[in-house]
Amino acid sequence: MNRTLTSALALGVSATLLSGCAMLGVGGGGGGGSDTKYVARDVNTLYNAAKERLDANNYEVAAALFDEVERQHPYSPWARRAQLMSSFSYYMGQKYNESINSAKRFLSIHPGNKDAPYAYYLIALCYYEQISDVTRDQKITEQALASLGEVQRRYPNSRYAADAGLKIDLVNDHLAGKEMEIGRFYQRRSLWLASSLRFREVVDKFETTTHAPEALYRLTETYLAMGLPAEAKKSAAVLGANYAGSKWYERAFELMQKHAPAA
């Protein structure tokens, strides 16, 4: 998935979280590679060091330093913010499991916090960023869909709900693509029933995706191959009613005229 686009909202919120640094009165400094070693430091110094590493795109070190803020100053008001910034830093560094764990820890400690929606959104983004091509296992894709749906259910009026909805559409399109890929695989091997079940899944569950017209055409093909012209006609009719101008309907019409003109 397009990381640049999906990161935009996450970056915007992280800027809001970091903007509070000015309230601490922190200045320069931040150290070098020794920043992540355990050295007792005041919260200002630690948080500033983490922010500098984040600004420098040194995400893993930034995450470790934000973790240190919580570890060394667990009762500071900045510990809670550091937890969430740790999750964001891991996300930006593409350490998605670590980001998810950090966000879940934040939610377990602060379930009703005003930034809880952002934590749920970060978790969803971490799964979303890991969606692979349609030829691979889709477990991560399903986790992304579930997490994005949770953002919508829990916080329908939040700034994240609309973006989650857009991503859900993309994830559904991806899942439909997987079903189509498997269906075509079976079809090439003349496994008509198996292929028809995959195409039917797309029509029934992912009818709003870009794959629906082709799925209806493939159903027309497979039903004809199985000697079921009446079922083929139904699929072609649905295709014509919903996608009359598509190339898939033109092909289905030609197919029906050639193989089942009386159906």
What spans do the regions from the language model cover?
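Sec-dependent N-terminal signal peptides
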Residues: 7-13
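Acidic, polar-rich low-complexity tracts and alpha-helical solenoid repeat scaffolds
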Residues: 2-6, 17-263
